[in-house]
């Protein structure tokens, strides 16, 4: 059965993406960083072991944007909070396990994605915890219907996001991948640059 990896992306417009990072380095530079980081990410995770999709926002501009690779299929994120949009993605994808990631996780590698899909062989859902209490990946096996209440009441952008999300899955079995760090602030960016200088290639 085909595996599906979905990367959620926003158009890299200054003042609309990475605004917390922009407070430290300027909105234009933050948008530039996001654009180039996501393009590198897409090159890394475009892998024959799964089908790569782009979930884009804003819906209309994202579907026609020339910023992202034109050979990758796109779907609009639609309205609502992050939970609404991810729930819609899980319900709309073709048959097969689905993993969703964002574009702001510079440490993620194909080995991390492969590990997540393998965990879905033994679990109904999988999460990749982030260092801030959220998560960089969520995946679902989807052998049964996606719960209607998935992601309802989650306190997004807080240290409770992961725990709240797991709670919405009820009795479904959950596995956890390695913890990774996203880049939301100047401090996060500095920490990533330090890791890059000293970390071995994976």
Describe every region a protein language model picked out.
Residues 32-50:
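A short, N-terminal amphipathic alpha-helix
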Residues 50-58:
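Short beta-strand/loop segment that forms part of the nucleotide-sugar
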Residues 1-20:
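N-terminal nucleotide-binding beta1-loop-alpha1 segment
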Residues 64-97, 158, 168:
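Short phosphate-binding loop-to-helix
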Residues 108-135:
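Conserved donor-nucleotide/metal-binding helix-loop-beta segment in metal-dependent transferases, i.e.
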Residues 143-166:
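Short, glycine-/small-residue-rich phosphate/pyrophosphate-handling segment
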Residues 99-101:
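Short aromatic-hydrophobic micro-motifs that form the base-stacking/packing surface
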Residues 160-202:
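Conserved alpha/beta core of the MobA/IspD/sugar-nucleotide pyrophosphorylase nucleotidyltransferase superfamily
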């Amino acid at each position: 059965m085909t595996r599906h990896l979905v990367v959620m992306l926003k158009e890299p417009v200054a003042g609309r993406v990475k605004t917390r990072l922009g407070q430290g380095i300027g909105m234009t530079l933050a948008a530039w960083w996001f654009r180039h980081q996501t393009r590198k990410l897409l090159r890394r995770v475009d892998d024959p072991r799964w089908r790569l999709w782009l979930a884009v926002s804003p819906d209309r501009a994202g579907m026609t944007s020339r910023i992202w690779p034109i050979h990758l299929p796109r779907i609009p994120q639609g309205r609502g909070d992050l939970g609404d949009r991810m729930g819609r993605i899980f319900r709309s994808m073709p048959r097969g396990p689905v993993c969703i990631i964002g574009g702001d996780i510079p440490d993620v590698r194909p080995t991390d994605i492969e590990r997540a899909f393998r965990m879905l062989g033994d679990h109904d859902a999988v999460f990749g915890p982030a260092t801030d209490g959220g998560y960089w990946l969520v995946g679902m096996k989807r052998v049964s219907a996606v719960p209607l209440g998935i992601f309802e009441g989650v306190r997004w952008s807080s240290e409770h996001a992961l725990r709240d999300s797991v709670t919405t899955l009820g009795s479904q079995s959950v596995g956890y991948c390695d913890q990774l760090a996203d880049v939301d602030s100047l401090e996060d960016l500095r920490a990533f640059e330090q890791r890059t200088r000293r970390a071995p290639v994976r």
